[in-house]
Structure formats: structure tokens, C-alpha cells
Swiss-Prot record:
Domain of life: Eukaryota
GO cellular component, one term: mitochondrial inner membrane
Organism of this sequence: Bos taurus (Bovine)
One example GO MF annotation: structural constituent of ribosome
Assembly, per entry: Component of the mitochondrial ribosome small subunit (28S) which comprises a 12S rRNA and about 30 distinct proteins.
InterPro entries associated with the record: Ribosomal_mL37/mL65, Ribosomal_mL65
GO biological process: translation
Main location group: mitochondrion
Record-stated family: Belongs to the mitochondrion-specific ribosomal protein mL65 family.
Protein's name in the database: Large ribosomal subunit protein mL65
Gene: MRPS30
One protein family per Pfam: PDCD9
Length: 435
């Protein structure tokens, strides 16, 4: 037999229905002031993501914990050690490259806009440098340096292949820079106390953008794209105070940074894994930790005649621009990090450097202003700042050298060198005007 079912009726407790309770809640008067009791403090720790979980929240917590460690660093050396400690595969950026249109790629990597021409001249004393400095003595010094390498010095050994011009231009530049700085130190006292480096390495390591790891034990994870520049300028001048800014820090540039939607492998760039380095050419304890001017010498494999023979005349100026953007970004970026700034603690003042790119005969001049180091995907979301690079077309210093005479010497190149070397910090300009 089937079991009988028994139904039991439960009486409803005397209270409000859901509809009535909702209406009562809406129409109830608000209670404020002393009638409200303080909410009890939670006696349990906050719920946070696991540090070892494979989730976005866990990854974000690991990143925040690492950033807090960098912020809590007590010295610049410790901060740089934390920032460069972890070694992953990174793209190696070569300032002097034969890649086609490398300057636009380098602008994308460094968030730099390029403006043709040099920035507007800053406030100068009553007289122009061309009227103050004895240009005849400077011209004679430059011609002596040229004739020393091209005429007076008789080399018995033949230069190695692809180094014929470099073997002559390198000693010429080694003589030119000290000669001009020595003659102009009477007009710019900063040069007298400056440090002149020869073939000193400059390194910079930074993160820009994100990518999905294609293979390996970390396959499928979203990771930052890492870059490293290992540069070696032929000569560089370091000073104890910062050069004045060319434009304000938040200056709105009407030019957009080129955007590259494909990977840097297409440039081509290659990934390597080795020690990360951030270095301006000296240690952090050196008081001469600000850059003044860099001098770069292009190798023979990038000389103008070879590019013309390969029907790559449009790449001649590209090589100059790419070298300037990569080298000056690395130098000014390392200077900013020596002062304690990094991607999550962006610069509060611009950092300025000057650059001269030459192949021994043609000279091109560049000015670089670093306005931001916030280049990571998270820090760059609401960052309107852009780094700016100004530059000129390459100009010949002379036409030819015949016997014991320099034909067609270009005074415009010499004047621009003088303007670069006479640039000084604001404090020195103010003292000069007072005196």
C-alpha cells in the first residue's frame, strides 16, 4: 500500500510582508547624528588575492608588492638593484643601425616625438656668442685638427677594411672636442669643471608595452616588453648641474608619437637575456651626474657613399635621427633614474641633453628633453607627456682637403658647435647677468 501523505499547515508569524517591508524602508525617516552607532571594526584581515595564484588579481598584487619594495628603497643604488635584478628576455636596441626607417620605431619604443630644427634660443647675455668668441681662433684650431689627421700625420700601416674613414675621424674627434672645450672654457666656466669621457659605456633598461608569451613554461601569460640600450659615445661632457629646459614639462606637442602595431622583431630586433644595466658613464656618487653634450661617430658601414651606392639616399638622415633618439634617450633616462625617478615615480622636472652625430665630415645636431619615464602599460594609460627630440639635417664641415689647405670650411657648423658648448645651467646665467 502506498503511504499516506500528511500535510501540516504552519501559521504565519505576525509581521510585515516583503512588499510592505520594502515600502516601510523607503518611507522610513533617515537617522543621523548621535542616533547612529559606530560600525564595529572588522576583526578579520582583509581578503586579498594569493601571491602564488595564476590569476589577474594575484599578478596585480605581486606587481604592487614589488613596486612598494622599490618605493621603500633607501638609496638610489638599492633602487637600481631592485629594478634591474630580474633577468628576462629583452629586446636589444642598437643606436647605430642599418634597419630601414629605424627612427620611427625608436620613437615608438621611447615615446619620443621628433621636431625638425633646433629649439628656440634661450635668454642670452647682451651680446651674441659669435660676437664674444674669437671665431678665427676656433676656426684655426679646427683646421689644425683636420690637417693633423689628413695631411701632417703619415700613417705607414693601412687601416683595416671598413675602417678607413673611422681610423682618421676618430683621432680627429678626440682632438676636436678637447680643443674647443679648452678654448671656450674662458667664456663658459662650466666647461672648466666638467668631465670629458672618451668611449665610456652608457646603458639603459626600461619597459614599454605588453605581450603574450608565446612559448616556454610561462606560455600564455601577459608580460611587459623589455628593452635594453648599450651605447658607447665617442665623447661626452658631464657637468654638476642640470641644463635649462627647452620647453615646459607639460608642453603640449602637436605631433603624435608613431604607433607600431607589429612586434619589434620586424625591425628587426632580437631578444637576449643578460644582465640589466642602467649607467650614465659614472657611478651614482659622482657629483658630475648631469649630461651636457654627447659626440657620436658613425662607422664606415653606415657612411654616406655606401648608402648612395645601395640606392638608400632616403636613409642617410634616418641613421642620424635614430642614433640621436636612442642615445640621448638612454643618457637622459639614466640621469633621471640616478635622481630617484622611475616609471611609477615620474620625473618632476625635465632632463635635457645635447648630441652631435658625425661621420668625420658631416655633422648633425640634436637636442633631447626627457619629460616622462612612465612608459609601462599601466603608467602610460593617462600620461599626456611626450619626450621631445629636435634635430637638424647633416651639414658638411668642409668640402675637401688639398695639400695643406682646408677648402670650403663651413662656419655654420662651427657656430652651432659653439652654441652647444656655451650652453650652461640657469644659475650660471643668472650670476653672469648680475656681474
Amino acid at each position: 500500500m502506498a503511504a499516506t501523505r500528511c500535510w501540516r499547515f504552519v501559521l504565519r508569524s505576525p509581521g510585515l510582508s516583503l512588499h510592505t517591508a520594502a515600502e516601510a524602508t523607503v518611507t522610513a525617516p533617515e537617522v543621523t547624528g548621535s542616533d547612529v552607532k559606530a560600525a564595529p571594526v572588522a576583526r578579520y584581515p582583509p581578503i586579498v588575492a594569493s601571491l602564488t595564484a595564476d590569476s589577474k588579481a594575484a599578478r596585480q598584487r605581486r606587481v604592487e608588492r614589488w613596486q612598494a619594495t622599490v618605493h621603500a628603497a633607501k638609496s638610489v643604488d638599492e633602487k637600481l638593484r631592485i629594478l634591474t635584478k630580474m633577468q628576462f628576455m629583452k629586446y636589444v636596441v642598437y643606436p647605430q643601425t642599418f634597419a630601414l626607417n629605424a627612427d620611427r620605431w625608436y620613437q615608438s619604443f621611447t615615446k619620443t616625438v621628433f621636431l625638425s630644427g633646433l629649439p628656440p634660443p634661450q635668454a642670452q647675455p647682451d651680446r651674441e656668442p659669435a660676437q664674444v668668441v674669437d671665431l678665427a681662433a676656433l676656426r684655426a684650431a679646427v683646421c689644425d685638427c683636420l690637417l693633423q689627421e689628413h695631411f701632417f700625420l703619415r700613417r705607414k700601416k693601412r687601416a683595416p677594411i671598413y675602417q678607413e674613414r673611422y681610423a682618421v675621424a676618430s683621432p680627429f674627434l678626440d682632438q676636436l672636442v678637447p680643443s674647443l672645450t679648452g678654448l671656450l672654457s674662458a667664456y663658459n666656466p662650466v666647461l672648466a669643471a666638467a668631465a670629458l669621457d672618451c668611449n665610456r659605456p652608457v646603458h639603459f633598461y626600461w619597459l614599454r608595452g605588453e605581450e603574450i608569451i608565446p612559448g616556454g613554461h610561462r606560455k600564455g601569460r601577459v608580460d611587459a616588453v623589455r628593452y635594453q640600450i648599450n651605447d658607447k659615445p665617442h665623447n661626452q661632457i658631464r657637468i654638476s648641474r642640470q641644463l635649462p629646459e627647452f620647453v615646459p614639462l607639460d608642453y603640449s606637442v602637436p605631433v603624435e608619437v608613431p604607433v607600431k602595431n607589429c612586434k619589434p622583431d620586424k625591425l628587426p630586433l632580437f631578444k637576449r637575456q643578460y644582465e640589466n644595466a642602467i649607467f650614465i658613464g659614472t657611478k651614482t656618487a659622482d657629483p658630475l651626474c648631469y649630461g651636457h653634450t654627447q659626440f657620436h661617430l658613425l662607422p664606415d658601414k653606415l657612411k654616406r657613399e655606401r648608402l648612395l651606392k645601395q640606392n638608400c639616399a632616403d636613409q642617410i638622415e634616418v641613421i642620424f635621427r635614430a642614433n640621436a633618439i636612442a642615445s640621448l634617450f638612454a643618457w637622459t633616462g639614466a640621469q633621471a633614474m640616478y635622481q630617484g625617478f622611475w616609471s611609477e615615480a615620474d620625473v618632476t622636472r625635465p632632463f635635457v641633453s645635447q648630441g652631435v652625430i658625425t661621420d668625420g665630415k658631416y655633422f648633425s645636431f640634436f637636442c633631447y628633453q626627457l619629460n616622462t619615464l612612465a612608459l609601462t602599460a599601466q603608467a602610460d594609460q593617462n600620461n599626456p607627456r611626450k619626450n621631445i627630440c629636435w634635430g637638424t639635417q647633416s651639414m658638411p664641415l668642409y668640402e675637401t682637403i688639398e695639400d695643406n689647405d682646408v677648402k670650403g670650411f663651413n662656419d655654420d657648423v662651427l657656430l652651432q658647435l659653439v652654441h652647444f658648448l656655451l650652453n650652461r645651467p640657469e644659475e650660471d646665467k643668472a650670476q653672469l647677468l648680475v656681474n
